[in-house]
Amino acid sequence: MNKLFFLLLTVVPFCGLQAQELNCQVNIVVDNKVEVSSTEQEIINQMKQSITEIMNNTAWTKDKFKIEERINCNLQIQIREIPATGAYRGDIQVSSVRPAFNSSYNSTVFNFQDENFQASFSRGAVLNYVPNQYRDNLTSILAFYAYFIIGMDYDSFSLKGGTPYFQEAQQIVTLAQTGGAAGWKSSESNKRNRFYLVDNMLQPVFEPFRVCIYQYHRLGIDQLYDKKEEGKKAISAAFNLLSPIMATRPNTVNVVSFLFGKTTELKNIFSDSELKDKQDLVNLLKKLDPANNTLYSTILD
């Protein structure tokens, strides 16, 4: 079944054999300043393989996906510390894309750098996600982002279609708080964490952001091939929905990450637009996210 058509219908659980939803590419990089023994490198290689397997082989939902319908995503893990054998600290960059209708183009839906990556992994370990159970921090991080990626993807195809998957991600946050690792609690000084990432998506005040995600992709990106000017107008209109959020919740991680990840795409889409249209768009983006004014100005180049 065509993925776009499927998501516009009421979601109905399927029985029987389940396909997997994600096509995840995993890369692990160790900082040059970190010494890595041959034994440690072997563990890291095994961890990469196990991460790839859990992301791509787990059936995260009850929906069926054809191979070509799987969500393309990337995990880039930057290891900055190895305090003990099999223990790792660093960052994880998570991104996902979705195809534009009637085109080979892929639009970035989610792009986020999580600075609270902490994981332990033993040689020969197998990562296995069990719903409603906390097993270890690494499994929780991976399951959280699997559901968040799926939620964002579904939101881009159907209005608030990702709600069940954001709820799953929120449940993972609640359970993972018992593990004591960073990134899961509202009390942390760094608000760019997993708690706020998913909590925001389920708060009523952020509903305009979810409408923006849908309008930007479904009414904007998906229209560019056949109705380019209408698509561009829909994209600009989608960003206008964000003003009430940023007026009360400035620098919100979800919105800022979304805008930041769309800059190159916007520059390409509006490259042939009138200068006034580009200037209006840039002024809006600067108003929404003043901290990245210089970045948004590149759309005018």
Language model regions located:
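Soluble non-cytosolic domains of exported or imported proteins
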Residues: 38-46, 136-141, 253
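Flexible, glycine-rich surface segments
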Residues: 158-251
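Start-of-domain marker
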Residues: 21-89, 100-102
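Sec-exported extracytoplasmic/periplasmic mature domains
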Residues: 52-60, 151-154, 267, 271
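Acidic/His-rich structured neighborhood in mature extracellular/periplasmic domains
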Residues: 84-199
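A cross-kingdom marker for long, charged
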Residues: 25-29, 213-301
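Bacterial Sec-dependent N-terminal signal peptides
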Residues: 1-24
